[in-house]
UniProtKB/Swiss-Prot annotation:
Gene Ontology molecular function: any one: zinc ion binding
Annotated Basic and acidic residues bias: 143-152, 161-182, 206-225, 295-306, 588-607, 868-881, 1071-1082
Sequence repeats: 1397-1403, 1404-1410, 1411-1417, 1418-1422, 1425-1429, 1432-1436, 1439-1443
Function: Induces apoptosis in cooperation with SIAH1A. Acts as a mediator between p53/TP53 and BAX in a neuronal death pathway that is activated by DNA damage. Acts synergistically with TRAF2 and inhibits TNF induced apoptosis through activation of NF-kappa-B.
Gene this chain is encoded by: PEG3
Assembly and binders: Homodimer. Interacts with SIAH1A and SIAH2. Interacts with TRAF2.
Residues in C2H2-type zinc fingers: 454-476, 507-529, 565-587, 627-649, 969-991, 1107-1129, 1163-1185, 1225-1247, 1282-1304, 1332-1354, 1505-1527, 1564-1586
Biased composition (Acidic residues): 129-142, 1395-1415, 1449-1466, 1475-1495
Spans annotated as 4 X 5 AA repeat of P-X-G-E-A: 1418-1443
Domain SCAN box residue range list: 46-128
Protein name, entry field: Paternally-expressed gene 3 protein
The keyword Signal is assigned to this record: no
Family: Belongs to the krueppel C2H2-type zinc-finger protein family.
Length: 1588
């Protein structure tokens, strides 16, 4: 028998985490005892081999070595033969496949080979095979119990005691994995434990049969338990161990058969007690969150990673799983619960007691329901743990009948189950009351509930951890709350419960008795009852029932007593928003009534503005059948289903339902915004005098984003027809309702298209008015958004006389080959046709399909819908002339418009035309053509009868923001309409700046020149005259509906100009021209057909390879070349006629997208007239003219070249003064031109005494602003508040002035009015670059090393000059002059001879390419008395050299007061200065040659100044400076014959007194900057600074 001294209840922690390697070291201490002992040792190592646990910190290699050693110890190849080894392996497999009920008994017998195993099995069959079948199971079970109990007590003892070595090696190493094996075998089973106790199985089955002799069988089972235990004790006494290790191994073998059982028992005991020291190693890890009640056995397998083993062999067989599935679920569950209490942790002297009394307690549970544990727990630790469990249960338990707790102190901690109306449920609940070991659903729950004291009353589930039980109760609480009108969406806990549900239908509906196997299904089912209950209790006050559940009280603690979610319709409150969502579905039917009320309000012109409460309510429900087909009335839950359904009506004949009243299709979206936009935010105004109907403000755009809907407004004097072409998206398959009229009396025909998508941002509102006296045909080109492959349906308006109307349909491909639409209208007296062309701004990704609808005189119609899905299908427009003679053709107006479309489509759409002013006046805004596209539509001839209207919709695709004719914001001055108030505000600045003279004959012609950024785009239709060429011959009345025919016809009128007509005025093309005809025209003009060249570069005919420029006749092979070429002609000059005296050219900014008109301008070369879209292009172009000898234009009195910066900045001063804007700034009084506004400001001071108002008007008449229109307009209204005191430039805010003042920070003098700034064609050097100046010669160098080498040359020269005393004296004077401060040098420069200031004054003008020269020196002949003729020529060479410098000053905002390094030495007021020293060097500031200093000292003595312009002489520099103000901007020099070279002989500039002495000295000049040097070596080294 096992020694009791090792028995201890406080030591099990070690057994749960065996130290395998310590065990190995212990085994190696006595190798003679272990190795070679025979089968005992072999079996021991076998178990260790099978149950070795991989320990990560040990490492894989050591683990492998360990496994190999254990295998060798087990098989012992040194002592065993191959046959014996094979026998061992076969025996292992045999033990695996034997029946489960025999395995414990066989393992207890420990067969050493296969023969012994077979003998045992045969003996078992003979011994336990019953004679009668009725008692076979009982007898077998008794025997199995007996055999099991032979090993159970020793196992119980040694599971908690034993010496230290045995505990580590034997039990911990081998049995502990078996502890977990029973749980890891199968997630569904506790099967091995059930089979270990066959009497328990018999008892369970007997209990299910409700046999009367249950008590007797229980007592028999108890006696068998005692007998089994005695057998085990005798067996242990018979086998005397040789030593301690052998004894431990023997005990291990005996306990091996009960390893699984004891392991589970111990685990269950731990979970039941809840405070076991082995909790960290428990086989039942707690899952407190998520209610994941995956069998704990499976969890332990995943967490521990143990090799699953079948008690002794660790191989999981399929047969075992099948046996588990076949086993009795109730017996398994109950058995496990019995076992969980059969072997609790207790002392050795109580072992026999617990083994006997446990069975007794289990039996008495069936008889005495109140004594579940009677004598089962005699030990304080267990009872304390159990009492704690019962306390928890009591704390959370409430009797649903209101009788209080039904828990007895000694009874099972189960509360009375919740009655659901099911007898089966009651029976299960009663069984759960009887015993802790019997779950409610004994047949369907294969989980061991005995060790789980927390039992759910709803479903009978048991839980071992309180947190899991609470989570589970939360789920039931949510389900139960449905009964009280509150619905919940089951949380993650419920979803986890669904995963853990095992077994049959265990969730039963309390209302109808239906059962479900998942709680989620039951929750969904209860929603049905909850909705019905809510309907019944809708108008009643239902008390909130208190659910006596701990989880509900927890919810109350979280949310409080008040519920937060209130139904705004019926004021019912809910705890969760999901409950409110479910509740609000009841009110869904009320919405339809509201919708009809909204329609009535709209008919009355009232405004419906839903409250925020309704908005929130509409957000809540979106899943009922909200999508109704207006054709057949069928409703759908999803919009996609409706789309699929509407295919049927689209493919069918939409005219079948022509007798029905056409209603608006209401297809709400799934969100609040989509839903709201369908029926609110519409404020319609109906005017009974026949005017258009409008939708106010943002309500129009919001409403029409979803769909385009037309409301019919009937006037007194007019009959109106709404023709609508709705945009659709790619997936739009909704039907289109086109209902012709049944009778002649009904003259209102309209087509309604519905579009449920929010991204349809293009509202279109068309009202076609038909009247006896007047007919208006308003046709809108609709644009859709992004990817649109849609239908576009046009329904003909039916006049009294039944007419045939043809609306051509074609399926356009990606580039929309055909963008042509035509409209002709004929009236009895006057016909007007207005076409709004709206160009889209996004790339076309869709097709344009127009349905071909033909209506005969009987009202019959047929429709041909192009296949929208076939991108390659090309259907040309067909000819379908209208039959019948034409009547009342006295006056006709026909405007046929073709709209082109480009790929990028980044242009802004044209604004709507002005309103009708007088009879015969019409406005035709031309479309913005970005790329040439060839039309593929054939010619269409349309003839009309009287009172007939034919409508052709032309659909360019893309996003547009200007709405045609439905625009609310109309300019009161010119009648132009805008979609947004901001656009109107920007537009009205034009009128604020300048008002017309008041005459009705003055009209504005606004030419917008678009500067594209995409090189693929082009400026087609440059001249508005060619777009409006007369394409209809009066004799034949021929109409052209497509641009292809129009282009053909335009060749005839290629040279005509539409502005030649005096009545129409003249408009030049800027891509978008709004022309409003003058008043007083008494006759109706002939039709104007504006056509745009529509050429698709990818769809060109193979023969069309030459693209001709319409302006100059040049031909190009590639369309892109023509596009680039036409940019030259894109900017047109204004033509002032008698009717149009004010013209404004402004630009649109593509990047700003029409919010403002600030953008890149077109830059025109004044030399040749060529225009460029970017200043860099003009910069490159003007380099050609820089090499010309003359800078002035031949045909102009004032010649100039506008040198523009690479990145032009807005000139603030130019913005303030309109006269300063543009590429050339000129004085409007005297015509004098300036490069920068600072010079002009100084010049304008001379004209202050003049009338400023008159000058401003003159400036505005001749202005060609280069800045954006909005910036220009803003400049007219803002006051010039901050003015620079140095240069006179004005700024809007002090910040700009502060930035500007920094330019003049270190300038000693104020600039005079004669100062003009020097501009470079390239940017100056960024930042301050240090210069190293040679004090000997005044030269500057970038690097100090170059200066050092340069000084060495001076040393050598000084050594050479020491021979001559005269040379040494001259060198000393040079040294003295070099150190003279820069300010002194400037003062000295003020006394320079008269020719030098003239040269310096002319130098900036040459470099800035000022063409306005009045008295240019042809050869630089402003010669002084001492031979200074070459000096101006030397200076004239500077522009060529300095042209390579960066754009320094031109980049400044206004260029005022900014000077280059050499200009720092200039006299601001026109005083003369040395050109070589400072002006010639771009790097040096105030640096001069030694000789120059000497000259200046001499010049100070006898100064006098000669003016080369008027040959006047001055002795005072101030007087001479004032005189030069009149010539400041008029001096220019001819360039050299060669680029960068001087054309004259270079000699030193000198004064009249000292010039003759040094006139013969020879110098070497730098070709780049013009600096002079004494020797070639110095020149070569200097030139290295330019080359880098």
């Amino acid at each position: 028998m096992l020694p009791p001294k090792h028995l201890s209840a406080t030591k099990p922690k070690k057994s749960w985490a065996p130290n395998l390697y310590e065990l190995d070291s212990d085994l190696t201490k006595e190798p003679d005892v272990i190795i070679g002992e025979g089968p005992t040792d072999s079996e021991f190592f076998h178990q260790r081999f099978r149950n070795l646990i991989y320990v990560e910190f040990v490492g894989p290699r050591k683990t492998l070595i360990k496994l190999r050693n254990l295998c060798l110890d087990w098989l012992q190849p040194e002592t065993h033969t191959k046959e014996e080894i094979i026998e061992l392996l076969v025996l292992e497999q045999y033990l695996t496949i034997i029946p489960e009920k025999l395995k414990p008994w066989v393992r207890a017998k420990k067969p050493e080979n296969c023969e012994k195993l077979v003998t045992l099995l045969e003996n078992y069959k003979e011994m336990y095979q019953p004679e009668d079948d009725n008692n076979s199971d009982v007898t077998s079970d008794d025997d199995m119990t007996r055999n099991r109990r032979e090993s159970s007590p020793p196992h119980s003892v040694h599971s908690f005691s034993g010496d230290r070595d045995w505990d580590r090696r034997g039990r911990s190493r081998d049995m502990e994995p078996r502890d977990r094996w029973s749980h890891t075998r199968n997630p569904r089973s506790r099967m091995p434990q059930r089979d270990l106790s066959l009497p328990v199985v018999a008892k369970t089955s007997f209990e299910m049969d409700r046999d009367d002799d249950r008590d007797s069988r229980a007592y028999e089972s108890r006696s068998q338990d005692a007998e089994s235990y005695q057998n085990v004790v005798d067996l242990a006494e018979d086998r005397k161990p040789h030593n301690t290790i052998q004894d431990n191994m023997e005990n291990y073998r005996k306990l091996l058969s009960l390893g699984v059982q004891l392991a589970e028992d111990d685990g269950h005991s731990h979970m039941t007690q809840g405070h076991s020291s082995r909790s960290k190693r428990s086989a039942y890890p707690s899952t407190s969150r998520g209610l994941k009640t995956m069998p704990e056995a499976k969890k332990s397998t995943h967490r521990r990673g143990i090799c699953e083993d079948e008690s002794s062999h660790g191989v999981i067989m399929e047969k075992f799983i099948k046996d588990v599935s076949r086993s009795s679920k109730s017996g398994r569950a109950r058995e496990s619960s019995d076992r969980s209490q059969r072997f609790p942790r207790m002392s050795d002297d109580n072992w026999k007691d617990i083994s006997l009394n446990k069975r007794e307690s289990v039996i008495q549970q069936r008889v005495y329901e109140g004594n579940a544990f009677r004598g089962g727990f005699r030990f304080n630790s267990t009872l304390v743990s159990r009492k704690r469990v019962l306390e928890r249960k009591r704390r959370y338990h409430f009797d649903t009948d209101g009788k209080g707790s039904i828990h007895d102190q000694k009874a099972c901690p189960r509360k009375k189950p919740f009655e659901c109306g099911s007898e089966m449920r009651k029976a299960m609940s009663m069984s759960s009351l009887s015993s802790l070991s019997s779950p409610s659903f004994t047949e369907s729950q294969p989980i061991d509930f005995g060790a789980m004291p927390y039992v759910c009353d709803e479903c009978g589930r048991s839980f071992s951890v309180i947190s899991e039980f609470v989570e589970h109760q939360i789920m039931h609480t949510r389900e139960n709350l449905y009964e009280y009108g509150e619905s919940f969406i089951h949380s993650v806990a419920v979803s986890e419960v669904q995963k853990s549900q095992v077994g049959g239908k265990r969730f039963e509906c309390k209302d109808c008795g239906e059962t479900f196997n998942k709680s989620a299904a039951l929750a969904e089912h209860r929603k049905i009852h909850a909705r019905g209950y809510l309907v019944e209790c809708k108008n009643q006050e239902c008390e909130e029932a208190f659910m006596p559940s701990p989880t509900f009280s927890e919810l109350q603690k979280i949310y409080g007593k008040d519920k937060f979610y209130e139904c705004r319709v019926c004021k019912e409150t809910f705890l969760h928003s999901s409950a409110l969502i479910e509740h609000q579905k009841i009110h869904f039917g009320d919405d339809k009534d509201n919708e009809r009320e909204h329609e009535r309000e709209r008919e009355r012109g009232e405004t419906f503005r839903p409250s925020p409460a309704l908005n929130e309510f509409q957000k809540m429900y979106g899943k009922e059948k909200m999508y109704e087909c207006k054709v057949c009335g069928e409703t759908f839950l999803h919009s996609s289903s409706l789309k699929e359904h509407q295919k049927i009506h689209t493919r069918g004949n939409p005219f079948e339902n022509k007798g029905k009243v056409c209603e608006e299709t209401f297809i709400p979206g799934q969100s609040l915004k989509k839903r709201q936009k369908t029926y609110n935010k519409e404020k319609l105004y109906d005017f009974t005098d026949g005017r258009d109907a409008f939708m106010q403000s943002s309500e129009l755009s919001e409403h029409q984003k979803i769909h385009s809907r037309k409301n019919l407004f009937e006037g007194r004097g007019y009959e109106k027809s709404v023709i609508h072409s709705g945009p659709f998206t790619e997936s739009q398959k909704s039907h289109t309702i086109t209902r012709p009229l049944e009778s002649d009396e009904d003259e209102k025909a309209f087509t309604i298209s519905s579009n449920p998508y929010e991204n349809q941002k293009i509202p279109t509102k068309e009202n076609v008015y038909e009247a006896k006296s007047y007919e208006r045909s308003v046709i809108h080109s609709l644009a859709s958004v992004e990817a649109q492959k849609s239908h576009s349906v046009a329904g003909p308006s039916k006049p009294k006389v039944m007419a045939e109307s043809t609306i051509q349909s074609f399926d356009a491909i990606n580039h929309q080959r055909v963008r042509a639409g035509g409209n002709t209208s004929e009236g009895r007296e006057y016909s007007r046709s207005v076409i709004h062309s709206l160009v889209a701004s996004k790339p076309p990704r869709s097709h344009n399909g127009n349905e071909l609808v033909e209506s005969n005189e009987k009202g019959e119609s047929s429709i041909y819908i192009s296949d929208l899905n076939d991108k390659r299908q090309k259907i040309p427009a067909r000819e379908n002339p209208c039959e019948g003679g034409s009547k009342n053709r006295n006056y006709e107006d026909s405007v046929i418009q073709s709209v082109s479309r480009a790929k990028p489509q980044k242009s802004v759409p044209g604004e709507g035309s002005g309103e009708f002013k007088k009879d015969g006046e019409f406005s035709v805004p031309s479309s913005n053509v970005r790329e040439y596209q060839k039309a593929r539509a054939k010619k269409k001839y349309i003839e009309h009868r009287s009172n007939e209207t034919s409508v052709i919709h032309s659909l360019p695709f893309g996003e547009q923001t200007f709405r045609p004719r439905g625009m609310l914001y109309e300019c009161q001055e010119c009648g132009e309409c805008f979609a947004h108030s901001s656009d109107l505000t920007e537009h009205q600045k034009i009128h604020e700046r300048e008002k017309p003279s008041g005459s009705r004959n003055y009209e504005w012609s606004v030419i917008r020149s678009l500067a594209p950024t995409d090189p693929q785009t082009s400026y087609a239709q440059e001249q508005y005259a060619k777009e409006q060429a007369w394409n209809k011959c009066k004799e034949f009345r021929q109409f052209f509906a497509t641009s292809e025919d129009l282009n053909t016809n335009q060749k005839i009128y290629d040279q005509e100009k539409s502005h030649g007509e005096e009545s129409q005025g003249e408009n030049t093309d800027g891509e978008e021209t709004h022309s409003e005809e003058t008043h007083g025209q008494e006759t109706i003009e002939d039709p104007v057909i504006q056509g745009s060249d529509m050429e698709d570069p990818q769809k060109d005919d193979p023969d069309d390879k030459i693209y001709e420029c319409e302006d100059c006749g040049l031909g190009f092979v590639d369309l892109t070349d023509l596009t680039d070429h036409q940019k030259v002609h894109s900017r047109k000059c204004l033509v002032d006629s008698r009717e149009y005296t004010h013209s404004v050219i402004h630009t649109h900014s593509i990047s700003e997208y029409q919010r403002d008109y600030t953008g890149e301008q077109l830059y025109e070369c004044p030399k040749c007239g060529e225009s460029f879209i970017h200043s860099s292009f003009l910069f490159e172009h003007q380099r050609i003219h820089e090499q010309d000898q003359l800078y002035s234009m031949k045909g102009c009195d004032d010649g100039f070249i506008a040198l523009l910066p690479m990145k032009p900045r807005r000139n603030r001063a130019a913005e303030r003064n309109p006269a300063l804007a543009g590429s050339a700034i000129r004085c409007l009084l005297c015509g004098q031109g300036f490069i920068h506004s600072s010079a002009l400001n100084e010049h304008m001071r001379l004209h202050r005494e003049d009338d400023l108002l008159e000058q401003s008007q003159m400036a505005e008449e001749a202005i060609i602003p280069g800045l954006a229109l909005t910036e220009f307009q803003r400049s007219q209204t803002e006051e010039r508040l901050f003015e620079c005191a140095v240069c006179g430039e004005s700024f809007i805010n002090p910040a700009e002035l502060a930035d500007h003042v920094t330019v003049h920070k270190n300038e000693p003098y104020e600039y005079g009015s004669s100062y003009t700034h020097t501009s470079f064609l390239t940017e100056p050097l960024k930042g301050a670059i240090p210069f190293y100046e040679c004090k000997d010669c005044g030269k500057s160098f970038i690097h100090s090393t170059v200066l050092t080498k340069h000084k060495e040359l001076h040393l050598e020269e000084e050594e050479e000059d020491e021979a001559a005393a005269a040379a040494a004296a001259a060198a000393q004077e040079v040294e003295a002059n070099v150190h003279v401060p820069q300010v002194v040098l400037r003062i000295q420069g003020s006394n320079v001879e008269a020719a030098e200031p003239e040269v310096e004054a002319a130098e900036p003008e040459v470099e800035a390419a000022e063409p306005e020269v009045e008295a240019a020196e042809p050869n630089g002949e402003a010669e002084g008395p001492d031979g200074e003729a070459a000096e101006p020529i030397g200076e004239a060479g500077q522009p060529n050299g300095e042209a390579e410098q960066p754009n320094g000053d031109a980049d400044e905002p206004d260029g005022a007061g900014i000077e280059d390094p050499e200009e720092r030495a200039e006299e601001p007021e026109g005083k003369a200065e040395e050109p070589e020293g400072d002006a010639d060097e771009p790097d040096g500031v105030g640096i001069e040659d030694p000789e120059e200093g000497e000259d200046q000292e001499i010049q100070v003595e006898e100064p006098y100044y000669d003016c080369h312009e008027c040959t006047e002489t001055f002795t005072s520099s101030t007087a001479f400076g004032e005189h030069l103000k009149t010539h400041a901007s008029m001096i220019i020099f001819e360039p050299a014959n060669a680029f960068g070279e001087c054309s004259g002989y270079i000699e030193r500039a000198s004064t009249s007194t000292g010039g003759a002495n040094q006139a013969d000295e020879k110098y070497f000049k730098c070709d780049v900057c013009g600096q002079l040097f004494n020797d070639r070596l110095s020149l070569a080294r200097h030139q290295n600074t330019h080359t880098g």
